[in-house]
Amino acid sequence: SNQLGMQNKHWTRKEAINHWVFWAVIAPFLIPPIFSTAFFFNMVHLTEIKDWSLISFTALFPFYTSMSIFTTLCSGWILDKFGVEKILPFYLLPMSLGLLIISFGNTYLHAMIGLAFLGMTQGLAMTIGGTFWPNYYGTKNLGSVRSLSTSTMVFGTSLGPAIVGMLLDFGHNYNSILLGMCILAMIASIS
């Protein structure tokens, strides 16, 4: 297709990088890969402080996966109906809620509900990313614009576990770290 982006033009990668919208949305797009990777990378520590069995906790992963798949399928219709610009400010809220529930909760039910909310944001993220870039930057140079955002997200996945690991090494409480991640996701939502 030959869809135009903002200002009725096809944006180059250089033009996209120099435009404020690119930098305004990169934080909300980075949050799910950074936080999800950090969360799952540190699940042994989480299960230890919550006094959960690692096997029982991982048995709850289908709730994450199922919600992610369900939300991915539904988000296409939602984005078509309301538009990416209306959904983007809200798509990190389920992740925030999931992190909040897991931070304060101590039961497997809390873990199950929290994982479902994390999966909801993951499902939304998969569809929102594919919709946002062509809508805002056009399709002619979509590969080069998306490759920049994707490589930034891949880099972000390496930062999450490293930052959380350092915070834990410095003696910070993991529940407080999860709460901080919740707050950062909410801030990124409204940015």
Task: Show the residue positions of the predicted features.
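Extracytoplasmic gate region of multi-pass secondary transporters
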Residues: 14-75
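MFS transmembrane alpha-helix packing/gate-lining sites
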Residues: 67-71, 121, 152-156
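A membrane-interface helix-boundary motif in multi-pass transporters
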Residues: 166-184
